């Protein structure tokens, strides 16, 4: 049983970039498809199959509507990791006899970077674009990196670690002018910020259900039909999903993703106001009470549900232990098992000592003002205690530049 404090249930969930709780309305929509409406959506000879197929197609149209796509352009997958792999490897395999170059960014999600490294072993040339100190790519650098051999540019919309929003419209315009396919991992932005695949000239986009208050184990890949984009499938079988992703579709999960998309479509403005208000309250109150706290990533060009903060003079892991009443992360959930400082922060040029102090706080639909105030009070009290114990903080206060110290190795 979770302890309660003035109607506040502890621990407080603040890791919305790792996953989100299922919205009760999503759960309600899914339940019948686990029980009475259990048909296979590919069974065309009876009403159980028709009922499931109708539910799948309705969900498909809900997902498409949220990004301005055509219903037929949505391919269901197991999640954004599979979608990213299908997009990047699928394009590379289909077009490798014509072109052999892909461009991505050093701060992409690990599954994009690993898919690209896999392709490098198969002879595809990969360019990893740097990011500026604010976490955003430089558009001129992108333009200059595109050659006549470039088949794909892959840039995520919202970074999972630092929350910065890349200029997708400008990137899409460059790609279209140069005749290069544009893929975006939109898992952290789908349903949270306005995304229009046509206005942004996006050719492929990866979507995840559990980042928008839907179930885990379901995602989608948007694949443009006009001009047509071709991908070689990763999974062979019955030819479902326009031949791009074989396997029986999990109707309950798809219904959940569809309902989550429908809610996001109708409530995006309300959610955005809520998240922006709590972000400003959290950050302003932290800055009023503690010195040398740094927001990682551009303050304005970002999704404000993500607060990645560095607390100078405090080790991030010790901070997480000290604030165990808050469920937070010191990196992306896929890489936070490692004690290495975040590769995203390091690629922004942030020094190792500050990168090690970074903690990501996630704010979402179900975060309350009371939870944010409790979090701020807890953080401030623990920071003061940890800094009082920290020889590094003492040295910094004495004006010693930690970058210039040569540490002895025992």
Swiss-Prot record:
[2Fe-2S] cluster binds at residue 334. GO terms for cellular component: L-cysteine desulfurase complex. The active site is at residue 334. Coiled coil: none annotated. Belongs to the class-V pyridoxal-phosphate-dependent aminotransferase family. NifS/IscS subfamily. Master enzyme that delivers sulfur to a number of partners involved in Fe-S cluster assembly, tRNA modification or cofactor biosynthesis. Catalyzes the removal of elemental sulfur atoms from cysteine to produce alanine. Functions as a sulfur delivery protein for Fe-S cluster synthesis onto IscU, an Fe-S scaffold assembly protein, as well as other S acceptor proteins. This is Cysteine desulfurase IscS.
């Amino acid at each position: 049983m979770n302890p309660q404090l003035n109607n506040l249930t502890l621990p407080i969930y603040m890791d919305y970039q790792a996953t989100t709780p299922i919205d009760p309305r999503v759960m309600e929509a899914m339940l019948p498809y686990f029980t009475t409406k259990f048909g296979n959506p590919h069974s065309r000879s009876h009403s159980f199959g028709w009922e499931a197929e109708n539910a799948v197609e309705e969900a498909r149209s809900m997902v498409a509507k949220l990004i301005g796509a055509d219903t037929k352009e949505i391919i269901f997958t197991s999640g954004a990791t599979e979608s990213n792999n299908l997009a990047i490897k699928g394009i590379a395999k289909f077009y490798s006899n014509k072109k052999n170059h892909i461009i991505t960014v050093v701060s992409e999600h690990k599954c994009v970077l690993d898919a690209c490294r896999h392709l490098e072993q198969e002879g595809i040339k990969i360019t990893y674009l740097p990011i500026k100190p604010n976490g955003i790519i430089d558009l001129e650098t992108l333009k200059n990196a595109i050659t006549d051999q470039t088949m794909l540019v892959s840039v995520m919309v919202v970074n999972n670690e630092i929350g910065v929003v890349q200029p997708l419209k400008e990137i899409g315009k460059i790609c279209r002018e140069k005749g290069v396919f544009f893929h975006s991992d939109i898992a952290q932005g789908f349903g949270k910020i306005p995304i229009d695949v046509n206005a942004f000239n996006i050719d492929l986009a990866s979507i995840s259900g559990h980042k928008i208050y839907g179930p885990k184990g379901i995602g989608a890949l948007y694949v443009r039909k006009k001009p047509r984009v071709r991908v070689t499938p990763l999974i062979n079988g019955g030819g479902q999903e326009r031949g791009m992703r074989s396997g029986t579709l999990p109707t309950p999960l798809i219904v959940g993703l569809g309902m989550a998309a429908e809610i996001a479509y109708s409530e995006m403005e309300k959610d955005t106001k809520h998240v922006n208000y709590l972000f400003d309250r959290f950050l302003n109150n932290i800055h009023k009470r503690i010195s040398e706290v740094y927001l990682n990533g551009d303050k304005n060009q970002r999704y404000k549900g993500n607060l990645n903060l560095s607390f100078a003079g405090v080790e991030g892991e010790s901070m997480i232990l000290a604030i165990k009443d808050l469920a937070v992360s010191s990196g992306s959930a896929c890489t936070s098992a490692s004690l290495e400082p975040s590769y995203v922060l390091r690629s922004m040029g942030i020094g190792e000592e500050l990168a090690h102090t970074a903690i990501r706080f996630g704010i979402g639909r179900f975060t309350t003002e009371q939870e944010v105030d409790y979090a701020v009070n807890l953080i401030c009290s623990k920071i003061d205690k940890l800094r009082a114990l920290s020889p590094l903080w003492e040295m910094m206060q004495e004006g010693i530049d930690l970058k210039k110290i040569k540490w002895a190795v025992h």
